[in-house]
């Protein structure tokens, strides 16, 4: 079952895809969005859903460190509702606390990307990979 992992921000959505067996997650792309113009990148997501035969979405929930929800959590949930309405596919949520920090560390320490501008281009994709991979591992443990 192929899933699409999404790291929803205010200006971009990082996108990752699982392999067909749902074991690993790979980065795919970063989609620019503009909430003020009601531009949510759904055309790009439709293209990806069709190309990869996606069967569901995993969105990160950027909770505060104390576990409480803020504006960013609401943004992710609203985005999830848009996806449900548009694609009629299941939407799952995964706690994403510190995934961007972890993604930044991976890019610097493991991939050797020290240029901040270069990291910024792929940080959302890497965060989406971490969200999706964490979800895949958590659901595999439950089964």
From Swiss-Prot:
Signal peptide from the UniProt entry: none
GO terms for biological process, alphabetical: rRNA 5'-end processing
Keywords carried by this UniProt record: Cytoplasm, Hydrolase, Nuclease, Ribosome biogenesis
Enzyme class: hydrolase
Family of the protein in this entry: Belongs to the YqgF nuclease family.
NCBIfam families: RNAse_H_YqgF (TIGR00250)
Function summary: Could be a nuclease involved in processing of the 5'-end of pre-16S rRNA.
Protein's name according to its UniProt entry: Putative pre-16S rRNA nuclease
Organism the protein comes from: Lactobacillus johnsonii (strain CNCM I-12250 / La1 / NCC 533)
């Amino acid at each position: 079952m192929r899933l699409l992992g999404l790291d929803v921000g205010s200006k971009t959505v990082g996108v990752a895809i699982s392999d067909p067996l749902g074991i690993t997650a790979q980065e795919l792309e970063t989609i620019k969005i503009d909430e003020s113009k009601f531009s949510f990148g759904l055309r790009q997501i439709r293209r990806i859903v069709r190309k990869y035969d996606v069967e569901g979405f995993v969105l990160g929930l950027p909770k505060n460190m104390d576990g409480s929800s803020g504006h960013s959590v609401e943004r992710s949930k609203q985005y999830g509702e848009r996806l449900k309405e548009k694609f009629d596919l299941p939407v799952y949520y995964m706690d994403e606390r510190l995934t961007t920090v972890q993604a930044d560390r991976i890019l610097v320490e493991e991939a050797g990307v020290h240029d901040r501008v270069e990291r910024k281009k792929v940080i959302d994709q890497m965060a989406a990979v971490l969200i999706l991979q964490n979800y895949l591992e958590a659901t595999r443990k439950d089964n």
